[in-house]
């Protein structure tokens, strides 16, 4: 049996530069992987069998099934796999769980079926599945550009602690598309925000003032209950709070583990779905 971890991520910066002629948006984003991980187990089988320990996870609505189908078409026609997923990353949370699992599927089947594709080829296949998938082929700290297909590894951040707060807000199935639909001319930026953050990271530091998410204002407008959770996060002791990806997860990053633990425990005592995790370096 082959077992792989699929880590969550947060966007330290997320800029939309413009809308492209092909209908996609040009992105510039610095992404950081986290120690909150799903676990995927692969074993040989005569047919494709996919299952999860989460009753709410549906294979037919996930990128996992699409990743298996795509890789089968490219390399594994007629081959099977018994794939089981232990879900730990909350569904539809903005933490990239579906994309991360899809990347792990491509890597896992590449090993299980002995296809021998190099990482760059797996990243190409990942780009066919979703914008975040190529990043999860390497993880760590990286710059993502284009519509997600261009990923450049960055110096690994010194370990930091992240507290995640997952609001109990019902999100529409087209959450991300809704955020993109609400972008306007003033939402676009030049990429300078990410450049400033990149400069900080290369100097071995992280400036909270350089963190940015273009979707934050839009999300708080479309989903006004987010404001209540942000306020409760502040009451728990956080002082810099950011939106994770397309949300609704909120997070804070700290160098002080004791402070992170205090905030985490304060949130848990209030009955919130919260996680205390650390930043991760590049994947093998």
UniProtKB/Swiss-Prot annotation:
Single annotated GO MF: ATP binding
InterPro entries for the chain: GHMP_kinase_C_dom, GHMP_kinase_C_sf, GHMP_kinase_N_dom, IspE, Ribosomal_Su5_D2-typ_SF, Ribsml_uS5_D2-typ_fold_subgr
Keyword flag Nucleotide-binding: yes
Active site residues of this protein: 9, 132
Listed GO biological process terms: isopentenyl diphosphate biosynthetic process, methylerythritol 4-phosphate pathway; terpenoid biosynthetic process
Record pathway: Isoprenoid biosynthesis; isopentenyl diphosphate biosynthesis via DXP pathway; isopentenyl diphosphate from 1-deoxy-D-xylulose 5-phosphate: step 3/6
Keywords: ATP-binding, Isoprene biosynthesis, Kinase, Nucleotide-binding, Transferase
Protein residues bound to ATP: 90-100
Top-level class of the enzyme under EC nomenclature: transferase
Organism domain of life: Bacteria
Enzyme Commission identifier(s): 2.7.1.148
Reaction(s) the record says it catalyses: 4-CDP-2-C-methyl-D-erythritol + ATP = 4-CDP-2-C-methyl-D-erythritol 2-phosphate + ADP + H(+)
Function: Catalyzes the phosphorylation of the position 2 hydroxy group of 4-diphosphocytidyl-2C-methyl-D-erythritol.
Family classification: Belongs to the GHMP kinase family. IspE subfamily.
PANTHER family found in the cross-reference section: 4-DIPHOSPHOCYTIDYL-2-C-METHYL-D-ERYTHRITOL KINASE, CHLOROPLASTIC (PTHR43527:SF2)
NCBIfam families reported for this sequence: ispE
Name this protein carries in UniProt: 4-diphosphocytidyl-2-C-methyl-D-erythritol kinase
Organism whose genome encodes this protein: Dehalococcoides mccartyi (strain ATCC BAA-2266 / KCTC 15142 / 195) (Dehalococcoides ethenogenes (strain 195))
Source lineage: Bacteria, Bacillati, Chloroflexota, Dehalococcoidia, Dehalococcoidales
Protein's gene: ispE
């Amino acid at each position: 049996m082959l077992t792989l971890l699929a880590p969550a991520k947060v966007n330290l910066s997320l800029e939309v530069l413009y809308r492209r002629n092909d209908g996609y948006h040009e992105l510039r984003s610095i992404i950081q992987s986290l120690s909150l991980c799903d676990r995927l187990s692969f074993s040989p089988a005569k047919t494709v069998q996919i299952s999860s320990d989460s009753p709410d996870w549906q294979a037919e609505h996930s990128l996992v099934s699409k990743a298996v189908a795509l890789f089968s078409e490219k390399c594994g026609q007629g081959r099977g796999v018994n794939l089981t997923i232990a879900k730990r990353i909350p569904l539809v949370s903005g933490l990239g769980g579906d994309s991360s699992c899809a990347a792990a599927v491509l890597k896992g089947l590449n090993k299980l079926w002995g296809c021998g594709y190099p990482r760059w080829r797996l990243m190409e296949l990942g780009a066919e599945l979703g914008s975040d998938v190529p990043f999860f082929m390497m993880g760590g700290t990286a710059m993502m550009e284009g519509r997600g297909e261009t990923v450049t590894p960055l110096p690994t951040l010194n370990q930091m602690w992240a507290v995640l707060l997952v609001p109990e807000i019902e999100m529409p199935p087209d959450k991300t598309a809704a955020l993109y639909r609400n972008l306007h001319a003033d939402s676009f930026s030049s990429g300078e925000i990410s450049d400033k953050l990149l400069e900080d990271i290369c100097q071995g530091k992280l400036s909270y003032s350089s963190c940015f998410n273009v979707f934050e204002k839009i999300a708080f407008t479309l989903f006004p209950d987010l404001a209540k959770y942000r306020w409760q996060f502040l009451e728990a002791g956080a002082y810099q709070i950011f939106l994770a990806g397309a949300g609704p997860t909120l997070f804070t990053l700290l160098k002080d583990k004791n402070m992170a633990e205090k905030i985490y425990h304060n949130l848990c005592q209030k009955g919130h779905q919260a996680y205390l995790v650390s930043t991760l370096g590049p994947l093998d």
